[in-house]
Amino acid sequence: MNNIKIFACPSAEKFTQEICDYLNLKIGKISHLKFKNDNNFVQILETVRQSDVYIIQTVEPPVNERIMELLITIDAAKRASAKNI
């Protein structure tokens, strides 16, 4: 389980923490910023190179915004050279 990294999108932080507690893992460090023009910026704050990355997101209203947060987070993990997402 050394190569497993679990990250939370903003609406799923509590749920992700429960998963990490159950698996005895630390939740991954990630920064989600939302600009005034509604653009999102995600930065993964730890190394995920060659790791299996799990991104937890809930799909509660507003659904479109939640899906975009998830897709942008997936893109950030891909750009950080995650092995599997």
List each model region and its residues:
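PRPP-associated nucleotide enzymes
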Residues: 1-85
